[in-house]
Amino acid sequence: MSAKQLGDLKPLFIEWLKDEIDACGPRQEKMAMVYFRARESLKRFDQPITETAKVLKVKGIGNSIKNKLASKLAQYCQDNNIPLEDAAAPSHVVGISVTRVRTATQEKDDQSPKRKKRKYVPRKRSGAYAILLGALELGCPSRGLTKEEIIDAAAKYCDVSFVSNPLTREFYSAWTAIKVLIDHDLMLEQGRPRRYIVTEAGEQMAETLKHADSVIFPEDCPYQRRQQAPESTAEDHTELSASLSELVRQEHLPQNHSGMCFSFEPPSSAPSDYLDPGQKSANVASSPHRLRPPIGPSIDIVKARWNGTSYELWKPGSYDIELYIDHREVRAKSERDFFVNALLTRGVTVEGKALALGDMVWVARHRDSRSTCVLNFMLERKRLDDLAMSIRDNRFMEQKNRLKKTGCKHIFYLVEETSGTNVAGMEGAIKTSIWMTYVYSGFHVKRTRNADDTVEWLHDMTCTVQRYYCSKSLLVLRPREIANQEDYGSLLSAFRLQFERNNTSLECCHAFDCYQEVLGKTGLMTVKELYIRTLMLNRGVSLEKALAIQSKFPTLRSLMTAFRNCKSEEDGRRMLYLALLDQPASRRVGKALAATLWDTFGRR
């Protein structure tokens, strides 16, 4: 039998990649993750693999893995007495047969020594250089790092800003270098929200850059902690799957290890899910999970997993409350930082951010890890004229629906009644909208006289939030994969149902980076949501009208097909008007709006 008769080589390659994963030791988690991602991508690859070179078409497989598979195929052919020249594998073998038909001149040219491809080395103080050093400073954890974590650590090593500014025609930032690092297999991107993992080659490159330029990291950074305790890093300790009551039990923990994070050493077959948090767990000493204090300094965070989702447990007093304000929230063009500066003078820890949703949100920042999570308090601020405009152009309902997706328990809608605001003719609509926000949406409505009054209220509210959380533990969710924005809220609800039902001293919340990536206007949108937003870009199309159109024409293609099937332009202009005549008044499309939608989607 020849190797050609093997047919599709994919099953063999999948098996060999599994062997590589199993061969990785406990200190080779990153390499195991590379092989795992390559194996999963190969499983999903729908074309047969008839030669080794074809695996380069598979996402996550580069020359290194291809060469390893080629070597294994050569060994397999040798062990099974299969002629190697028939094997549809190594690309260099195929190249030999091609060379035989070349002319003598070409063969002479080929004999000249080929220039070796230069290894990629990031330029000093460039974006790629800074990203690698920032990730190394953070310890290159196997769980990966978020974009925000990397930028916070990397900014000082780069001469270019990590934030683009289209107003000054700076369309690219230093962060775009992450694509170069991924292309050179120095970093991996995975999951949603996205996390970035430094590969073994990337870590070696970062170490080389650090020593070449004599870069000195801060004494308390994760890299230094890992150097002091190489066998047990604070960031990469084992996640436990057990009952929550066992995790938070204080009286059984050794007193001489206060302030440390106790990792749990699971048995050979750990339970897949958490037990009921309300049930009594046995003494930790008699538990099948043995407490193992880490070596050297560590961080006071318990990491665990429930129902396939990782989470962290932050104890009371281990975190601080901060207020994030969207940097687009301004008092006037000449006072863009008014709210941040005014609150800073009142002793409030506040920071301007580009928030994905909401105008202000209260977050908790862990004192040791410096990671942040979104608390159950957020605020949408509207000046009276802005509120009137949002009602008129249908942004009001859309914004409220997006706020509901957060699953936040306490959403405040603050209306600033600035003097001299012209809302003539909108008084009734404003009153109705405020009452609907309070009664039907369940939001807290707060009315202030002006921006100064808003600042005073924010100061008092921040103090209230700090008192509320002074004795609460936080269960911070860190999901690896969220399919859409609905999953964000449903996952939070599932955790609350499991952990908060009998425990008033604990609250579940998402990590801030997850909040930022998932809840953006264009983040993780379904086709249906994108279709509805496309309809709402037309002036006069409210959320109710867009939903009514979507119920009659489920997809944009079906709507455009219906327009094309109209016999005349006049029929096309009246089609949506006639199709929605049986709908309630708020969901109907008038003749003028129907004509506008025809001009947008139907006119050829």
UniProtKB/Swiss-Prot annotation:
Gene3D superfamilies: 3.40.50.10130, Crossover junction endonuclease EME1, DNA-binding domain (1.10.150.670), DNA polymerase beta, N-terminal domain-like (1.10.150.110), Winged helix-like DNA-binding domain superfamily/Winged helix DNA-binding domain (1.10.10.10). One of its GO terms (biological process) is resolution of meiotic recombination intermediates. It is found in: Nucleus. GO terms for molecular function: 3'-flap endonuclease activity; crossover junction DNA endonuclease activity; DNA binding; enzyme inhibitor activity; metal ion binding. Residues 322-419 form the ERCC4 domain. Its EC number is 3.1.22.-. Residues 268-290 are annotated as: Disordered. CDD domains: WH_MUS81 (cd21036), XPF_nuclease_Mus81 (cd20074). It holds the Pfam family ERCC4. It is an enzyme of class 3 (hydrolase). Keywords: DNA damage, DNA recombination, DNA repair, Endonuclease, Hydrolase, Magnesium, Meiosis, Metal-binding, Nuclease, Nucleus. GO terms for cellular component: Holliday junction resolvase complex; nucleus. The keyword Coiled coil does not apply. InterPro entries: DNA_pol_lamdba_lyase_dom_sf, EME1/EME2_C, ERCC4_domain, Mus81, Restrct_endonuc-II-like, WH-like_DNA-bd_sf, WH_MUS81, XPF_nuclease_Mus81. Its cofactor is Mg(2+). Interacts with EME1 to form a DNA structure-specific endonuclease with substrate preference for branched DNA structures with a 5'-end at the branch nick. Typical substrates include 3'-flap structures, D-loops, replication forks and nicked Holliday junctions. May be required in mitosis for the processing of stalled or collapsed replication fork intermediates. May be required in meiosis for the repair of meiosis-specific double strand breaks subsequent to single-end invasion (SEI). Interacts with EME1. PANTHER family: CLASS II CROSSOVER JUNCTION ENDONUCLEASE MUS81, CROSSOVER JUNCTION ENDONUCLEASE MUS81. Belongs to the XPF family. This is Crossover junction endonuclease MUS81. It comes from Eremothecium gossypii (strain ATCC 10895 / CBS 109.51 / FGSC 9923 / NRRL Y-1056) (Yeast).
